[in-house]
Amino acid sequence: MHRTIFTTPVVNTLLRGLSLTILKLTGWRVEGSLPPDCPKCVVIAAPHTSNWDLPNTLIAGFALRMNLYWMGKRSIFAPPFGALMRWLGGIAVNREKSTNLVAASVDAIRAADGPLQLVVPPEGTRGATRHWKTGFYYIALGAKVPIVMAYMDYQRKLS
């Protein structure tokens, strides 16, 4: 996988401190932690309903010392923000055509040297859906990694 803000040592340390401060100042709490025996996993974060999900996920990721990668629609990776989005752990997804994303994700997780948590919104969109897409399941199955469930409760300020 590509180098990210989570794998940049000094920046990671500074942003962890900043994230913990932001959580405290805004009244948010991060509950739970990653299971200790899963350095690699697929994290499904639901429901994905707000543009604030990404910054809040990054903050929670720093607080939990995660090495996050996340999937986002291709349009947010366009210039001038594309390089920044990739450095934040983003992986562009073209939702308009089939691109073997599951197979590529499986290969990337298997090839990763260290810890890696791939965040996938199971709905595939911020809009209302009646059911989840299944890509996250097949990524985890193919990579032989666990699925970890996560959430953002904006009303109670819990993550």
Identify the function of each model-found stretch.
Residues 25-159:
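Soluble catalytic domains of membrane acyltransferases
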Residues 1-30:
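Extreme N-terminal tail/first-helix region
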